[in-house]
Amino acid sequence: MLVPLKWLRDYVDIDIDTQEFADMMTMTGSKVEKVDFFGKETNGVEVCKILEIEQHPDADRLKVTKVEVANGEILQIVTNATNIKVGDYVPVARIGAVLPGDFKIKKGKLRGVLSEGMFCGAEELTIPSAFVEDHKKDGIYILDHQDSFELGMDVRDVLGINDALIEFEITSNRPDCRSII
């Protein structure tokens, strides 16, 4: 069973190192298979708001968007995403951001149009599919308006993926470990 440490911290004060916590849980009979960290390979991805979407002048499947990030800064992003619309809040990897696989975002042109970053989906953010709603698994990850965030915030903090993920082995003698609460 996968358990984000953040979920546990919502109910219990855990003021020790993550690995020490995992070792203590194993000593109680709740075997920890592994400890992984959400977002450890992602850096520089932030929240933006889509202001405009236009058709790319030289490509049928590409769109040219204008987005707002922190401090009213406007960026132009070229994308092939089909699930976005004006007013959506989405994760954007700006120039200099690093995605899993040591993929660095650079300024570039797509079919002659400048792109100053890349929109991200759940896969680029390395969110385990078990934690992603079905309608958010494909395409760009659209943030819910009820989430509390500001433009420019680190998307790992907004989505709670800047945390440890603990995988427990559910042994036959511990059926009580089949749920968190």
Task: Tell me the role of every PLM-derived stretch.
Residues 1-181:
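Phosphate-backbone binding interfaces of nucleic-acid-interacting proteins
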